[in-house]
From Swiss-Prot:
The keyword Nucleotide-binding does not apply. It comes from Xenopus tropicalis (Western clawed frog). The gene is lamc1. Disulfide bonds join 269-278, 271-288, 290-299, 302-322, 325-334, 327-350, 353-362, 365-378, 381-393, 383-399, 401-410, 413-425, 428-439, 430-446, 448-457, 460-475, 707-716, 709-723, 725-734, 737-753, 756-764, 758-775, 778-787, 790-808, 811-825, 813-832, 835-844, 847-864, 867-881, 869-888, 890-899, 902-915, 918-930, 920-937, 939-948, 951-963, 966-978, 968-984, 986-995, 998-1011. This is Laminin subunit gamma-1. Laminin is a complex glycoprotein, consisting of three different polypeptide chains (alpha, beta, gamma), which are bound to each other by disulfide bonds into a cross-shaped molecule comprising one long and three short arms with globules at each end. Glycans are attached at residues 43, 117, 559, 633, 1005, 1041, 1048, 1090, 1144, 1158, 1188, 1206, 1253, 1363, 1386, 1477, 1487. The keyword Repeat applies.
Length: 1592
């Protein structure tokens, strides 16, 4: 579906491009143009650091307003319809078929602080207008945008989005930038950080929104840089959640992940206003199609010939096109010259001017050329280089001649002069560095040192370099690891020294005996020295540390210097006082050799030259090559430290002169070799490409030989010789065909190995007899001679016999087949035919009906298992189960996977209708469970019934502890069954809770039928007692009113009450007195009563004991009440926790979103019930207290009655009755306490039940909190331990830092010492500078004296007199003239040599290019190398041309100056002496210039030097000097620079054309490869018609 859409887009884009071709010009005038505005991210590659689907994983989609509803799906990168890769971020955004990228879920750890990066590579810089993201899930809580302004550059923050800006990104939440602030700073906003919407939320970032300079964009480089980006990165930091992830529910965690359906970047291809479109170049890279004479990927540069003004960005006001250079039609090349632009307003500086012209605009003639008219070409002056003062002529072509020379071109001598040379006859010009004596008095030839040659000993012999006066052999032999005898002094090296000062220690020096054993070494801090003391006559040596060893080849011919003294001058020298070891060699020398002194008690300086010459008697004698080889791998320097027994030797400062790369005083003794074929490197130490070591064990000393590659490679590994095989060959020497090719590779042609006609480039073989090519290694899954068939276990149609060709793929049977079986799947369709492990389906990817499990599990035991559903607990007609979990469909209140058990609190599974509820009474049963078959509940003692809902017969007090037995007295009770309060129904005359006592005024007759009424007289007593009880009750009521204060009693009322009480007491007293008047019978009866009273006293004591027991029971009741309160409080706490948890969760049921949920109501009801029970407990406690007070009051009244002795047995009976009441109240209190306890337990149970009902919300209970607290405590303890360890580590670090501090202090001291040394060196340099300035001053004074003498010289003839003034002026410029001549000749040689090398390099490059043409298929690397070589060659030619121009200009100036000296040729002795002194200065300046060719420069310097040493002018010697200069001029003239430059330019042009052709061929090949890769990538990776196994 996407292909037609892309085709339409391509047609639209093509039309847009064609329409935009002329947007950069309007009627021929340039104007600002820009590429079209595009989605730069469309079909661009996005790299994601995390993507779901590997391995397949489940995710859940949140729906609804709050995301409560979830549907779960599978993300599988191996299945097309289930994958969500990063490529879906930038594909076509089809709303009808949405595709999206998706990360792993929070269950896999995707949450802050872990992050996910989505990196978009645009392939080129774009001006970004906006970045838009469309999220398939809810937008993140925190994410950020970053950009890069160039490839491989740093990531720059672009924008932050976060609901917690300060916490997450340390940024304030704001959406704009104030004027004056940095406009390139990224802002943070919470605009798009809400969790809603759950899908389809957009985030659009505008790059210029909120930035003050956006309205002046063209004049804001800051914002121009801000909108530029080559790459965009989205960093996802924190997911948005509903907060329910804290409970770690897997299903909840699977619902949180990142998912983005569209990633768009709006902008324009960045072309700086100089292009209207972007295209792909030959390397398939996006670049601007530049106009306005610009080029570059962003049109950021001017074309080579359009440099007349600096490049600028095009604006709406000015297109700022690049302007062409003004070269007057004589050049097509130029560069931008800033200085020229500042001074003239035009910066185009022309190069390569034609017609021998020069100047920034080719407006004048080159040096040594002239013309009479500006419109004419310039002609060569052709001045004789020997006889002319300058090679530059005037506008008429006339040259200025030297003294004694004549002719228009100064090509012949004047009369009286001969031997036309540069300066006439001059003194003997022997070079002091290369000669040993003066020259031959007759021939002028000098006597040279051993390694020096030349007429004046001015050059080194072949195989030697660096002419050095201090070298007894004159020149140093070339080392070059023995591979070359041609070398010269290398540039870029400076003099350096390896030094040990012993100011801070031994600095790595050790001591050894002669046999190599270690010896004690001491550091003498006072004198900054190290010392050894020998206990015998055997010498002890100081051993140099590693910095003096290794590759010390740069110290060859230099000095090893050290200071040494002995404790006692009793020395016995030997031939091995100084020993050098290395490369298997060992040489030594006595201490007094090379002019050094005997050791003494005073410190002396010893200097040894590291040279094998006989003047420095190193023994044994070795060749120069062996000595240098030893220094290349110096392993030991041993300085003898003891020269007598028990005498100490002290070694002080040690220094070894060497050379290192860098700026400073040059070190000309370092060589650079001219390597023969097969060698490269400064010292020819490496094999050239195409060569290898003949003997790798010899390292750089081994010869290099050609690679042996059977004609299939030009290069090989220089060490191992393994070839870089081409032409489809392989092997160390390309002796066989590569895998996938066949043939004979030893033939040596490019077509030796042909590709095997096998799929996938697999290997093949040729049948010798039939010559038939047969595939030997078919791709996995194929078979046949040409791999045309699918193998067993694979399916497909490789030849397309049944439709479109399809590659063979392995049958996907989910590992649920027998791999040893044949025919597991259909070879054409791939359908699995032999599923095992109870699996089925097209791919054996689901369980068979009646089975469940994970068919994709690795363990067969965990695959599909039988459902085995219980027939009694399963819904009728359902034989299967859930294929994933195995859960059978159970009847109501039936549980377990196989529906084999009732839920807790249910029974009767065998009914086939589901389980029935037990309905056990909450107080009567021990638990809510019952017998699963009968339904009988487990009852408390004394309780019966199937639901434990009633007491057993003859029991009472139904409660959580069971029922108590009535224990009714069978004699006094009408029935053994008591009432609910435990009181039995008594017969007449019986009282008491158990009917075991007689009623008042009744007595127990043991022989009679129970309790019988007392005689009638006792009724009077009873009546009186009742009367007293009434009064006592009134008194109690009065006291109660007084104690409770319910009435507002005034004083009068209180007194009235007191009077009434007093009256009642008096009446009572009168009644008591009247009782004395009774008859004797009454007295007798009172005696009986008295006897009875005694008995009652005993009972009273028992009553007291019982009262104490009652108090104890009351206290126990109070304790139980307190326990009950504690249980209620605990229940309240649990309820509050549950309530808080419910409030925090705020679950809204699907059927209602406004009413509180049932659990909250139940929790509130339980809370109220607990509070009500708690109030009842308080009331019971109050009643218990009142009962206790009543018992105490009864005891007090009883004691009062006993004390008065007037109380009657009726009072005792009253007390008994009150005691019985108190006891009953206590029992009732106990009963109520039990009831409250039972109700509290029931409330607790209901709270626990409510708590248990909260399983659908997070499990918040005290156990979990306690476990969490324990975990936190454990973590705290671990943290404490970690802190302790860190403290110990910190202490260790402090100790280590103290050591480091000492080291730093030592280094600082050493640095100060080195600084002092540097100061000393600077002081010495300043002194040398002062001496040089003094010498220069003396030179100027001498020159002034010479000028004074010159003013007094006589005139030779009329011509001399006419030019005397000019001659005097010219004479003062002799030093500059001589220096100019020297530099001119030097640069002439440099130009010749460089041009020769450049020409050779060009020919070599051309040859390589021709060879590369034959290898076009693999030429990319060589073509790049050839192009680089051509560029380097062209650069060298350009540089040489510039140097040649400078040289010719200097020669012109020299000739102009020498021409003015023509009249002074016959100067007298004083004039020659002055010229000689001036020439010395020229020699000094010439020696400081750079020299590439030592021959000519050395010759001129030596001539000038010898001239300065003569006291008079020798005409013969001047002739020799002039001849030498003449030769140099001829070399310059014969060099034919113009022709060579033209040839080199032509070769470079041809080479560039060839390289362009190769580049085009390579680009075509690369495009073909890319096309094949695209075709390969479009092939399906799997079967797209895979049926969905399980609907989400």
């Amino acid at each position: 579906m996407r292909a037609p859409v892309l085709a339409v887009l391509a047609v639209l884009l093509l039309g847009t491009v064609r329409a935009a071709m002329d947007e950069c010009y309007e009627e021929g005038s340039p104007q600002r143009c820009m590429p079209e505005f595009v989605n730069a991210a469309f079909n661009a590659t996005v790299v994601a650091t995390n993507t779901c689907g590997t391995p397949p994983e489940e995710y859940c989609v949140q729906t609804g307003v709050t995301g409560v509803t979830k549907s779960c799906h599978i993300c599988d990168s191996g299945q097309f319809h289930l994958q969500h890769g990063a490529e879906y971020l930038t594909d076509y955004n089809n709303q009808a078929e949405i595709t999206w990228w998706q990360s792993q879920t929070m269950l896999a750890g995707i949450q802050y602080p872990s992050t996910i990066n989505l990196t978009l590579h645009l392939g080129k810089a774009f001006d970004i207008t906006y970045v838009r993201l469309k999220f398939h899930t809810s937008r993140p809580e925190s994410f950020a945008l970053y950009k890069r302004t160039h490839e491989d550059g740093p990531w720059i923050p672009y924008q932050y989005y976060s609901g917690s800006c300060e916490k997450t990104y340390q940024k304030f939440n704001r959406g704009f930038i104030r004027t004056g602030e940095d406009e390139q700073q990224a802002l943070c906003t919470d605009e798009f950080s809400d969790i809603s919407p759950l899908t389809g939320g957009n985030v659009a970032f505008s790059t210029l929104e909120g930035r003050p300079s956006a309205y002046n964009f063209d004049n804001s480089p800051v914002l121009q840089e801000w909108v530029t980006a080559t790459d965009i990165r989205v960093t996802l930091n924190r997911l948005n959640t509903f907060g329910d992830e804290v409970f770690s529910d897997p299903k909840v965690l699977k619902s949180y992940y990142y998912a983005i359906s569209d990633f768009a970047v709006g902008g324009r291809c960045k072309c700086n206003g100089h292009a209207s479109e972007c295209v792909r170049n030959e390397f398939e890279k996006i670049v601007c199609n530049c106009k306005h004479n610009t080029f570059g990927s962003d049109c950021e540069k001017c074309l080579p010939f359009y440099n007349d003004r600096p490049w600028r960005r095009s604006t709406a006001d000015s297109p700022n096109e690049c302007l062409p250079c003004n070269c007057n039609g004589r050049s097509q090349e130029c560069y931008f010259d800033p200085e020229l632009y500042r001074s003239t307003g035009h910066g185009g500086h022309c190069t390569g001017c034609a017609d021998n012209t020069d100047g920034p605009n080719c407006e004048r003639c080159r040096e040594n050329y002239y013309r009479q008219d500006n419109n004419e070409p310039c002609h060569a002056c052709q001045c004789n280089p020997v006889g002319s003062l300058s090679t530059q002529c005037d506008n008429y072509g006339r040259c200025s001649c030297k003294p004694g020379v004549m002719g228009e071109k100064c090509d012949r001598c004047q009369p009286g002069f001969h031997s036309l040379t540069e300066a006439g006859c001059r003194p003997c010009a022997c070079n002091p560095a290369g000669s040993t004596d003066e020259c031959n008095v007759e021939t002028g030839r000098c006597s040279c040192k051993d390694n020096v040659e030349g007429f004046n000993c001015e050059r080194c012999k072949p195989g030697f370099f660096h002419l050095d006066e201090a070298n007894p052999r004159g020149c140093t032999p070339c080392f070059c690891y023995g591979h070359s005898s041609v070398c010269s002094s290398a540039e870029g090296y400076r003099v350096s020294s390896i030094v040990s000062t012993f100011e801070s220690g031994v600095e790595g020096w050790t001591a050894q005996q002669r046999d190599g054993s270690e010896y004690s070494l001491s550091w003498v801090s006072d004198s900054s020295a190290v010392s050894v003391i020998s206990e015998s006559y055997f010498p002890i040596y100081f051993i140099a540390p590693a910095k003096f060893l290794g590759n010390q080849g740069a110290s060859y011919g230099q000095n090893l210097t050290f200071s040494f003294r002995v404790e006692r001058r009793d020395t016995r020298l030997s031939a091995e006082d100084l020993v050098l070891e290395g490369a298997g060699l060992r040489v030594s020398v006595p201490l007094i050799a090379q002019g050094n002194s005997y050791p003494s008690e005073t410190t002396q300086r010893y200097i040894f030259r590291m040279h094998e010459a006989t003047d420095y008697p190193w023994r044994p004698s070795v060749s120069p090559f062996e000595f240098q080889k030893m220094l290349q791998n110096l392993t030991a320097i041993k300085i003898r430290g003891s020269y007598s027994e028990r005498s100490a030797g002290f070694l002080e400062e040690v220094s070894l002169v060497t050379a290192v790369a860098g700026a400073g005083p040059s070190a000309p003794w370092v060589e650079i070799c001219s390597c023969p074929t097969g060698y490269i490197g400064q010292f020819c130490e490496r094999c050239a490409p195409g060569y290898r070591r003949e003997n790798p064990s010899q390292g750089p000393y081994s010869p290099c030989v050609l690679c042996t590659c059977n004609g299939h490679s030009d290069t090989c590994d220089p060490e191992s010789g393994v070839c870089d095989c081409q032409h489809n060959t392989a092997g160390p020497h390309c002796e066989r065909c590569s895998e996938g090719y066949y043939g004979d590779s030893t033939t040596g042609s490019a077509s030796d190995c042909q590709p095997c006609p096998c799929p996938g480039g697999s290997s093949c073989a040729v049948v010798p007899r039939t010559k038939e090519v047969v595939c030997t290694n078919c791709p996995l899954g194929t078979t046949g001679k040409r791999c045309e068939l699918c193998d067993d276990g694979y399916f497909g149609d490789p030849l397309g016999e049944n439709g479109a060709p399809r590659p063979c793929r392995i049958c996907e049977c989910s590992n649920n087949i027998d791999p040893n079986a044949v025919g597991n799947c259909d070879r054409l369709t791939g359908e699995c035919l032999k599923c095992i492990y109870n699996t089925g389906g097209f791919y054996c990817d689901r369980c068979r009906d009646g089975f469940y499990g994970n068919p994709l599990a690795q363990n067969p035991d965990l695959k599909c298992r039988a459902c085995s559903c219980n027939p009694y607990g399963t819904v009728k007609g359902q034989s299967g189960c859930n294929q994933v979990t195995g859960q059978c469909e159970c009847l109501p209140h039936v549980t377990e996977r196989d529906c084999s058990a009732c839920e807790p609190g249910f029974y009767n599974l065998l009914s086939g209708r589901g389980c029935e509820r037990c309905d056990c009474h909450s107080l009567g049963s021990t638990s809510g469970q019952c017998d699963v078959r009968t339904g009988q509940c487990e009852c408390h003692p004394g309780i019966s019934g199937q639901q434990c809902q009633q007491c057993e017969p003859n029991h009472f007090g139904f409660g959580p502890e069971g029922c108590k037995p009535c224990d009714c007295d069978p004699e006094g009770s009408g029935s053994l069954q008591c009432k609910e309060d435990g009181r039995c129904e008594c017969k007449s005359g019986f009282v008491g809770t158990r009917c075991d006592q007689c009623e008042e005024n009744y007595f127990y007759n043991r022989s009679g039928p129970g309790c019988q009424e007392c005689p009638a007289c006792y009724r009077l007593v009873k009546d009186k007692v009742n009367e007293q009880r009434g009064k006592l009750q009134e008194l109690e009521d009065l006291l109660k009113n007084l104690s409770t204060g319910e009435e507002n009693i005034t004083d009068q009322a209180f007194e009235e009450r007191l009077r009434e009480a007093e009256k009642a007491v008096n009446d009572l007293l009168l009644d008591a007195q009247s009782s004395k008047d009774v008859d004797q019978g009454m007295l007798d009866r009172l005696a009986e009563i008295n006897t009875t009273l005694s008995f009652q006293l005993e009972r009273l004591q028992n009553i007291r004991d019982m009262i104490r027991d009652t108090d104890k029971q009351a206290q126990e009741a109070r304790d139980r009440v307190e326990n009950t309160e504690f249980i209620i409080d605990s229940a309240r706490v649990q309820l509050e926790k549950a309530k808080m948890a419910i409030a925090n969760v705020s679950i809204t049921p699907p059927e209602s979103t406004g009413d509180p949920n049932n659990m909250t109501l139940l929790a509130e009801e339980a809370r109220k019930l607990a509070e009500r029970h708690m109030q009842e407990a308080r009331d019971i406690e109050k009643a218990a207290k009142e009962a206790n007070d009543t018992a105490n009051e009864a005891l007090r009244l009883l004691q009062k009655t006993l004390a008065s002795e007037n109380q009657t047995a009726l009072d005792i009976e009253e007390l008994n009755r009150k005691y019985a009441q108190a006891k009953d109240i206590a029992r009732e209190l106990e009963k109520q306490a039990s009831k409250v306890h039972a109700e509290a337990e029931e409330a607790g149970n209901r709270a626990l039940q409510i708590y248990a009902n909260l399983t659908s919300v997070p499990s918040i209970d005290t156990t979990a909190l306690q476990n969490e607290a324990d975990k936190i405590q454990k973590e705290a303890e671990e943290l404490d331990s970690l802190i302790d360890r860190k403290l110990r580590d910190y202490e260790d670090l402090r100790e280590d830092m103290r050591g480091r501090e000492m080291e730093v202090k030592n280094l600082l001291d050493k640095g100060k010492t080195e600084q002092q040394t540097a100061d000393q060196l600077l002081a010495r340099a300043d002194a040398a500078k002062a001496q040089a300035e003094e010498a220069a001053k003396k030179g100027r004074e001498t020159l002034q004296e010479a000028n004074d003498i010159l003013n007094k010289l006589r005139d030779f003839d009329k011509r001399v007199n006419d030019n005397k003034t000019a001659a005097e002026a010219a004479l003062r410029k002799i030093p500059m003239i001589a220096q100019t001549i020297a530099e001119a000749n030097n640069k002439t040689r440099q130009a010749e040599s460089a041009l020769g090398n450049a020409n050779a390099d060009a020919r070599g490059a051309k040859s390589k290019a021709e060879e590369a043409e034959a290898l076009a298929n693999t030429v990319q690397k060589k073509a790049a190398t050839a192009r680089a070589e051509a560029d380097n060659t062209f650069k060298e030619v350009t540089d040489l041309d510039g140097e040649l121009q400078d040289m010719l200009q200097q020669l012109q100036e020299a000739e102009n100056q020498l021409k003015k000296k023509q009249a002074e040729a016959e100067s007298d002795e004083k004039m020659a002496e002055m010229a000689s002194n001036a020439t010395k200065d020229a020699e000094s300046n010439a020696n400081n210039s750079k020299k590439s060719v030592n021959g000519v420069l050395a010759t001129i310097d030596e001539l000038l030097s010898r001239l300065g040493q003569l006291d008079s002018v020798d005409v013969g010697q001047l002739t020799v000097l002039e001849k030498t200069l003449d030769d140099a001029k001829n070399q310059l003239r014969d060099s034919d620079l113009d022709r060579k430059l033209a040839e080199l330019q032509e070769s470079s042009n041809l080479q560039r054309v060839a390289l362009d052709s190769y580049s085009r061929d390579i680009d075509q090949i690369l495009r073909d490869i890319a096309n094949l890769e695209d075709i390969k990538n479009t092939l399906p990776a799997g079967c797209y018609n895979t049926p969905i196994i399980e609907k989400p």
